[in-house]
Regions:
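Glycine-rich, aromatic-lined ligand/substrate-binding cores of catalytic
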Residues: 244, 249-251, 259-265
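N-terminal, active-site-proximal structural segment of metallo-dependent hydrolase catalytic domains
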Residues: 32-173, 200-224, 238-242, 255-257, ...
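Sequence/structural signature of beta-propeller domains
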Residues: 73-75, 139-140, 162, 204, ...
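Sec-exported extracytoplasmic/periplasmic mature domains
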Residues: 85-89, 97, 102, 106-116, ...
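Metal-dependent phosphoester-hydrolase catalytic domains
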Residues: 35-36, 178-186, 190-196, 234-236, ...
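N-terminal secretory signal peptides that target proteins for export/translocation
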Residues: 1-14
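A surface/extracellular/periplasmic glyco- and lipid-processing/surface-interacting theme
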Residues: 180-242, 281-286
Length: 426
């Protein structure tokens, strides 16, 4: 973390600049920001619960840099907050917000605070977000092993999850409703080899026609499955509990013919599926406190996150995400869509021209040459929840030129789902 001390004049300038940035975004009309209207419940006494996921791309080059920038005033973070304010989810997961025990709290207090909301003078806005959870992740945590086999240790590829410092590419959950922190289950330390039938990466053996393991046994037995972590975050809403199942699997690229990242991405998604399956397939799961077993069969849950796998296009092992999307424990509903995704695909060249999926379902605006725009961010409710509406926050220029420019704060787009939540009667 940087130890540089700013002069009082530099600090005042930074604060004034930050306040100006926030004021500009708050002065944008709801129409300019393309606010997303909330659905109406179909059952008397029920509430509408909006759940979202958003890879905010708020990762930085060095430890502590994000928090330091947030305290000074960060233009990207102000845009991310404005997107969140336009969609106004009750519960949301942020991927790629660096973890250092302070960043999530600073972002909440300085960019999503009730004071800013009061200043906006928009009576249609929902109550403020009060609760958050941010925990340690595997990215940047040195394994002490030569994981990539290049004869060197202590490099980014030798961390339990790729990263240059602990907490890079972290994640956090924010909520208007109470997070039951004492009941959170995390799976940061779960070992890949503990998964039955794990996709162990293999490579050719120059002295044999048979394949050999890319990772030696001594390394394989220690490898952690989660590139960041997997979380089960219980949230108390109207007397009932919603489990937000959060993760951010590794991209299935940046490797070699052994496809070690593709295998890992597949099994990180499989862990989600096994955990919520409601049968013996998740019996092997053990959390960081030593508690074994999957989620209860009668639980209401939402799987959320940048899963880095498109079911149709891209370079991943699509069978895992396809199985997850088709799982009987998940609600059957159309994929969230946007007009901006269609517009972006029509205006781009390269890989998008060869894609087979509906561009309206894309959730990321990536390199036109490769991989092109993809659907890799998901909000997947359990089958015992009624889906009222869903969408990808990606306004077209014709809908709102201002909002279309705003979403460029990240290469991912926020995905949201409206659920009917029937509260317990008092």
């Amino acid at each position: 973390m940087s130890t540089a001390i700013e002069s009082p004049s530099e600090l005042r300038i930074g604060i004034l600049l930050f306040n100006w940035i926030v004021a500009v975004f708050l002065m944008m009309s709801p129409q300019a920001r393309a606010q997303v209207p909330r659905s109406e419940p179909t059952v008397a006494g029920a509430m509408v619960l909006r759940v979202a996921t958003f890879n905010a791309a708020m990762n930085r080059k060095s430890a502590g840099e994000l928090t330091e920038g947030l305290q000074k005033g960060d233009p990207q973070a102000a845009k991310i907050a404005e997107i969140l304010r336009a969609v106004s989810p009750d519960v949301f997961l942020l991927n790629e917000i660096d973890y250092d025990e302070r960043s999530a709290e600073v972002f909440l207090n300085r960019y999503l605070s009730s004071q800013e909301r009061q200043d906006s003078q928009e009576p249609t806005e929902q109550p403020p977000w009060k609760y958050f959870f941010a925990g340690p992740v595997n990215t940047g945590v040195d394994s002490g092993l030569d994981l990539d086999g290049n004869g060197k240790m202590h490099e980014p590829n030798d961390a339990w999850g790729f990263g240059t410092y602990p907490g890079q590419y972290g994640m956090a959950v924010f909520s208007r409703h109470e997070i039951q922190k004492e009941a959170i289950r995390t799976f940061q330390n779960f070992r890949w080899s503990r998964m039955p039938g794990a996709l162990r990466p293999m490579r050719s053996n120059p002295g044999s026609t048979e394949l050999e393991s890319y990772y030696p046994d001594a390394v394989w037995d220690q490898l952690r499955l989660s590139s960041k972590s997997h979380w089960d975050v219980p949230i108390l809403i109207g007397g009932k509990t919603l489990h937000l199942i959060a993760s951010h699997p590794t991209p299935p690229v940046f490797d070699g013919p052994e496809d070690r990242n593709g295998c890992r991405n597949h099994d990180e998604i499989r862990l989600l599926m096994d955990y919520v399956a409601g049968d013996s397939s998740g019996a092997y799961v053990v959390d960081d406190n030593g508690r074994t077993g999957p989620l209860a069969t009668d639980a209401s849950f939402v799987i959320a996150g940048d899963l880095n796998s498109d079911p149709i296009d891209g370079d991943g092992r699509a069978e895992a995400i396809r199985k997850l999307l088709e799982h009987p424990r998940l609600a059957k509903s159309p994929a969230p869509k946007s007009l901006g995704g269609v517009e972006a695909s029509e205006n781009s060249k390269g890989a998008n021209l060869k894609h087979q999926a509906d561009p309206a379902t894309d959730t990321g605006d990536f390199n036109d040459r490769n991989p092109g725009n993809l659907r890799i961010d998901f909000v997947l409710p359990s089958a015992n929840l009624k889906v009222l509406a869903s969408g990808v926050y990606w306004p077209s220029k014709s809908q709102s030129a201002e909002a279309n420019a705003l979403v460029g704060a990240s290469d991912h787009r926020l995905v949201w789902v409206d659920l009917q939540w029937e509260q317990l009667k008092q």
